[in-house]
Amino acid sequence: MDSNIKQPRLITFYAATGHLMMHMFAAFYFVIVLAIEDDWNFSYDELINLWLLGSLLVGLGSIPAGWLSDRWSRSGMLAIMFIGLGTSSILCGFSNNKFSLMINLSALGLFCSIYHPAGISWVVNLSLIHI
């Protein structure tokens, strides 16, 4: 296969995978909380509020993530996002109290914030090279 064709396909694959993971990981908690509600004997509202800081960090973290991706490395930031999403989601699974779950969900939100500023600019810059 010609490398000129292979490169854009890899870019598309990694960009689509990153985008899918970012949105899926941010949305999983709303389903998982239904099982946690019974196991931990907390109300749905109490458990949903644990995602408040994480959801704020999805938006607020995008500003420094974009700044860092512009000055350092877009692909490096995406690698950090993939590793961070995996690590923080595993830590969420090991959480056994509300405080640790809130901290780990906040980390998940922070790593989710990386995709849009780093991933979109990465795709645009690389697509301009291959036009």
Protein language model features and the residues they cover:
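Extracytoplasmic
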Residues: 14-44
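Small-residue-mediated transmembrane helix hinge/kink sites in multi-pass secondary transporters
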Residues: 34, 63-67, 120-121
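Cytoplasmic helix-loop-helix junction between adjacent transmembrane helices
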Residues: 104-129
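Short hydrophobic/aromatic, small-residue-rich stretches within specific transmembrane helices
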Residues: 48-55
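Residue-level signature of mid-helix packing/kink "hotspots" within the transmembrane helices
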Residues: 27, 55-63
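Conserved MFS/SLC helix-loop-helix module at the cytosolic interface between two early adjacent transmembrane helices
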Residues: 60-96
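Paired small-residue
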Residues: 88, 99-107
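Hydrophobic alpha-helix/TM-entry signal in multi-pass membrane transporters
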Residues: 11-16, 78, 101
